[in-house]
Design a protein with these regions (language model features):
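Thiamine diphosphate
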Residues: 1-126, 189, 193
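Short coil/turn connectors at secondary-structure junctions
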Residues: 14, 40-44, 83-88, 110-116, ...
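Glycine-rich beta-alpha junction loops
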Residues: 50-52, 122-124, 180, 209-216
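Conserved thiamine diphosphate
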Residues: 133-200
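Flexible, low-complexity linker and terminal segments
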Residues: 1-4, 8, 14, 199-244
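Active-site-proximal loop->helix
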Residues: 102-107, 127-141
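Short, hinge-like loop/turn segments at secondary-structure boundaries
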Residues: 62-65, 108, 133-137, 223-226
Length: 244
């Protein structure tokens, strides 16, 4: 009998501890599959964020480092410069990357550091209680803006890919929405392209993933997928922003 589906070697045997419908698990598995296909598991050093994916080191079978909040690009930069033969990726959420870590991600991209970043945009601070994030949509409710985000008070959402695309350093920037099987395939293709760019020494790359947070959005997992397509993609359109 032919085996057509199995657990990637890039994942450990530890079960994911995420909320039902959370898309971190999908992205974790996709990263693991790509590491398997490119024979990177034994060569990789991943950098964990602070946030819901803080325990990512329990799930990935490659070497992992835990970074302080927002500092994953700086840590990844240091690792890659000291160990240039290693493959290095960083994994960050929107509060981690686009708020406290804004300086780190902008300057890593501006320098063209030869690292890969996977950026999870679920428009909320998940681990700390559903507060407004830099990516929270106008009118979207959060615990820190219960009446909805008001641009007169809270400003406007930050579009990370568009912002980084103004720099000369990035070699590849893409945003994907894995809300369907076709979307998951696009996610895998994007992550693989990002990883291949690093292998080729092309410099900085980032894949932004539009994800759900059923717990803090207070919606069913299915309704969350629809919400991404109907509300997030008009503000954060999927597509390739840089590909050198």
């Amino acid at each position: 009998m032919q085996k057509v589906f199995e657990r990637p070697k890039g994942l450990t045997d530890v079960d994911f501890g995420y909320c039902a419908g959370c898309m971190h698990s999908i992205v974790h598995r996709t990263i693991a599959e790509v590491m398997d296909e490119l024979d990177l598991v034994d060569k990789t050093i991943g950098v964990c964020p602070v946030g819901c994916a803080v325990f990512m080191y329990d799930y990935m079978s490659c070497d992992m480092i835990e970074a302080a909040h927002g500092r994953a690009p700086a840590v990844a930069t240091g690792v890659k410069r000291v160990l240039p033969d290693k493959f290095v990726w960083a994994y960050q959420g929107d509060g981690d990357l686009a708020s406290i870590g804004t300086a780190e991600i902008i300057h890593a991209a501006a320098r063209g550091e030869n690292i890969s970043v996977v950026f999870i945009n679920n428009t909320t601070y998940g681990m700390t209680g559903g507060q407004m994030a830099p990516t929270t949509l106008i009118g979207q409710r959060a615990t820190t803006c219960p009446s909805g985000r008001d641009p007169a008070v809270n400003g406007y959402p930050i579009r990370v890919c568009e912002m980084l695309a103004t720099l000369d350093g990035p070699s590849y920037l893409e945003r994907v929405a894995p809300t369907s099987p076709a979307g998951v395939m696009k996610l895998k293709k994007a992550i693989k392209h990002s990883f291949e760019n690093q292998i080729a020494g092309k410099g900085f790359s980032l894949v932004e993933v539009l994800c759900t947070c059923p717990t803090h959005w207070r919606q069913s997992p299915y309704d969350c997928l629809k919400w991404v397509d109907e509300n997030m993609t008009p503000v954060y359109p999927p597509g390739v922003f840089v590909d050198k």
